[in-house]
């Protein structure tokens, strides 16, 4: 059990050098929404989220994300003909859905 925990800790440290979006340390009183709580006071933060997008997305563990383009998630799942170019894509790291 201890070896498993040690291995997991080492693995997480090795993978911890990559940030796509998030917060970095600095004195601040910003409030953020987390996965489990809303309006959490952060005493050390700098917003790293970009206001302009470069057009590229981070790959995770060597897998590229799938971009739905003009297709909605529901349209992709339900088989909308507009989403036919997504047929056959069976492996991705995350889904990018454009706001319309």
From Swiss-Prot:
Example of a GO cellular component annotation carried by this entry: host cell plasma membrane
The UniProt GO MF terms for this protein read: host cell surface receptor binding
Other information? Major glycoprotein, comprises over 80% of the envelope proteins present in virus particle. The extent of infection into host organism is determined by HA. Influenza viruses bud from the apical surface of polarized epithelial cells (e.g. bronchial epithelial cells) into lumen of lungs and are therefore usually pneumotropic. The reason is that HA is cleaved by tryptase clara which is restricted to lungs. However, HAs of H5 and H7 pantropic avian viruses subtypes can be cleaved by furin and subtilisin-type enzymes, allowing the virus to grow in other organs than lungs.
Known glycosylation sites: 26-27, 39
Give the UniProt subcellular location, in the record's own words. Answer: Virion membrane; Host apical cell membrane
What is the purpose of this protein? Answer: Binds to sialic acid-containing receptors on the cell surface, bringing about the attachment of the virus particle to the cell. This attachment induces virion internalization of about two third of the virus particles through clathrin-dependent endocytosis and about one third through a clathrin- and caveolin-independent pathway. Plays a major role in the determination of host range restriction and virulence. Class I viral fusion protein.
Question: What's the main place this protein lives?
Answer: virion
Gene assigned in the entry: HA
The uppermost taxa in this organism's lineage are: Viruses, Riboviria, Orthornavirae, Negarnaviricota, Polyploviricotina
Q: Which keywords fit this entry according to its UniProt record?
A: Clathrin- and caveolin-independent endocytosis of virus by host, Clathrin-mediated endocytosis of virus by host, Disulfide bond, Fusion of virus membrane with host endosomal membrane, Fusion of virus membrane with host membrane, Glycoprotein, Hemagglutinin, Host cell membrane, Host membrane, Host-virus interaction, Lipoprotein, Membrane, Palmitate, Signal, Transmembrane, Viral attachment to host cell, Viral envelope protein, Viral penetration into host cytoplasm, Virion, Virus endocytosis by host, Virus entry into host cell
> Which Gene3D superfamilies does the annotation name?
3.90.209.20, Hemagglutinin Chain A, Domain 2
The UniProt PTM text for this protein says: In natural infection, inactive HA is matured into HA1 and HA2 outside the cell by one or more trypsin-like, arginine-specific endoprotease secreted by the bronchial epithelial cells. One identified protease that may be involved in this process is secreted in lungs by club cells. Palmitoylated.
Which residue ranges traverse the bilayer?
Answer: none
List this protein's GO terms for biological process: clathrin-dependent endocytosis of virus by host cell; fusion of virus membrane with host endosome membrane; fusion of virus membrane with host plasma membrane; virion attachment to host cell
Where does the source fall among the domains of life?
Answer: Viruses
Q: What is this protein called?
A: Hemagglutinin
Its assembly, as annotated, is: Homotrimer of disulfide-linked HA1-HA2.
Q: Would you identify the family this protein belongs to, as annotated?
A: Belongs to the influenza viruses hemagglutinin family.
Q: What is the membrane topology noted in the UniProt record heading this document?
A: Single-pass type I membrane protein
Q: Which InterPro entries match?
A: Capsid_hemagglutn, Hemagglutn_HA1_a/b_dom_sf, Hemagglutn_influenz_A, Hemagglutn_influenz_A/B
Signal peptide residues are 1-16
């Amino acid at each position: 059990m201890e070896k498993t925990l040690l291995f997991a800790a080492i693995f997480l440290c090795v993978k911890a050098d990559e940030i796509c979006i998030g917060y970095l340390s600095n004195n601040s009183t910003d409030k953020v929404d987390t996965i489990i709580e809303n309006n959490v006071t952060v005493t050390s933060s700098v917003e790293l989220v970009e206001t302009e997008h470069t057009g590229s997305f981070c790959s995770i563990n060597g897998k590229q994300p799938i971009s739905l383009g003009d297709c909605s998630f529901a349209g992709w799942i339900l088989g909308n003909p507009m989403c036919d170019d997504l047929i056959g894509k069976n492996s991705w790291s995350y889904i990018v859905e454009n706001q319309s």
